[in-house]
């Protein structure tokens, strides 16, 4: 009986200690879970902030690059005269359009390719070219004063110094294990308490068996407490790892938010620079790069227009060759079909003449059907015009197509 009382007291003390250990572990684990959840969310938001900050740096880069590009273009093309080369190329393309007479077979109301050119747009382009030249150098001086080449490099350097590649600690999975250990101690205490209540009602053999079981459990309690302490140590280690992760996130947040705030303030300044740049571009001739690009695009467009017209005539000629070839094939095939149909019709007539009087009409009504035949119908959406092809001296295939077309026509 004294042993039972001793084991019960030991079990009660062990249960109190186990509850304390589990309570401490639970608190550390819950605090760690809360901090980890918040820090992970903060980490993700920080990555988005880093992307946004990088995007703002990129915008600054683009703005700086645009300013430098505009300055270079102004230096290379400071006056309207230096755009004359592009203008002359455009005029050469337009002259080719004037000299290119439209084939009458096309049925167009115009006489040459130049009739398709928008004269109003061309004159507007020339007027704009003349209008932007006078104030170029004043704009150049103002624009040069807005260029801050070291600004973006400084922001990039500070942004790259903020590392966000660290990972959160792995999840602590000792909670269920500690709960099981606490349950073992609680069950042992319950068994000891129950044994005290029923001990006097048991036989000597039952008392002996009960004492053996309780003694075995009592001997196991210290190892359970050791495991609980180990679990608490592991939870504290996990808590410290979470705090270290949280500290990294907080530190990176402090640095990056300060950088983003500063960048936003300077972005406003940069926006003012961009607004001033747009104003100068509209008023003092910074449209030169755009106008030069328009000249290049127009020259290319009208050059390709002339080439496309020549290619169109060759395409019509190619289609004529195709139609002649197909018609020749169809004519030959139709002749063969008619020959076969005539032979088949004769065979059916001969058969009917020989056996028709002896075959009842109700035996097979189709005995007098005509032979299988086909109808080939030509579908042409638009009749091809009879245009004159402008041969390409360097295009041997064009000459071969023209030769094959002539051969097919003779057929």
From Swiss-Prot:
It is a peripheral membrane protein. This is Autophagy-related protein 17. GO terms for biological process: autophagosome assembly; macroautophagy; mitophagy; pexophagy; piecemeal microautophagy of the nucleus. The keyword Transmembrane does not apply. Keywords: Autophagy, Cytoplasm, Membrane. Its main location: cytoplasm. Residues 390-404 have a biased composition (Basic and acidic residues). Residues 388-411 are annotated as: Disordered. Belongs to the ATG17 family. One of its GO terms (cellular component) is phagophore assembly site. Disruption phenotype: Impairs atg8-processing. Homodimer. Component of the atg1 kinase complex composed of at least atg1, atg13, atg17 and atg101. Interacts directly with atg13. The gene is atg17.
């Amino acid at each position: 009986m004294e042993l039972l009382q001793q084991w019960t007291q030991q079990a009660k003390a062990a249960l109190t200690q186990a509850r304390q250990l589990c309570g401490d572990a639970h608190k550390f684990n819950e605090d760690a879970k809360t901090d980890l959840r918040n820090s992970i969310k903060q980490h993700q938001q920080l990555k988005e902030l880093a992307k946004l900050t990088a995007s703002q740096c990129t915008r600054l880069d683009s703005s700086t690059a645009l300013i430098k590009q505009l300055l270079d273009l102004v230096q290379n093309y400071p006056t309207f005269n230096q755009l004359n080369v592009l203008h002359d190329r455009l005029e050469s393309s337009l002259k080719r359009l004037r000299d290119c007479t439209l084939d009458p077979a096309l049925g167009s109301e115009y006489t040459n390719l130049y009739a398709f050119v928008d004269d109003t747009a061309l004159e507007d382009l020339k007027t704009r070219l003349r209008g932007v030249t006078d104030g170029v150098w004043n704009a150049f001086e103002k624009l040069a004063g807005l260029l801050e080449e070291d600004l973006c490099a400084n922001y990039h350097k500070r942004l790259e110094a903020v590392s966000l590649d660290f990972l959160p600690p792995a999840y602590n999975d000792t909670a269920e294990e500690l709960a099981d250990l606490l349950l073992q101690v609680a069950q042992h205490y319950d068994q000891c308490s129950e044994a005290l209540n029923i001990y006097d009602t048991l036989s000597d053999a039952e008392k002996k068996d009960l004492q053996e079981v309780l003694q075995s459990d009592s001997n196991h309690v210290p190892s359970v407490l050791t495991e609980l302490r180990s679990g608490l140590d592991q939870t504290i280690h996990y808590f410290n790892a979470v705090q270290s992760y949280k500290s990294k996130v907080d530190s990176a947040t402090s640095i990056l938010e300060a950088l983003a705030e500063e960048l936003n303030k300077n972005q406003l300044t940069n926006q003012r620079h961009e607004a001033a740049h747009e104003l100068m571009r509209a008023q003092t001739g910074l449209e030169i790069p755009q106008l030069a690009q328009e000249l290049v695009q127009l020259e290319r467009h009208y050059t390709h227009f002339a080439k496309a017209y020549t290619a169109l005539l060759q395409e019509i000629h190619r289609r004529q060759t195709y139609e002649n070839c197909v018609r020749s094939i169809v004519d030959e095939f139709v002749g063969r079909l008619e020959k076969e149909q005539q032979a088949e019709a004769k065979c059916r007539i001969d058969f009917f003449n020989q056996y028709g009087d002896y075959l009842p009409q109700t035996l097979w009504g189709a005995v007098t059907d005509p032979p299988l035949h086909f109808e080939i119908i030509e579908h042409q959406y638009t009749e091809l015009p009879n245009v004159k092809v402008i041969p390409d001296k360097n295009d041997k295939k064009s000459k071969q197509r023209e030769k094959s077309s002539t051969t097919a026509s003779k057929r």
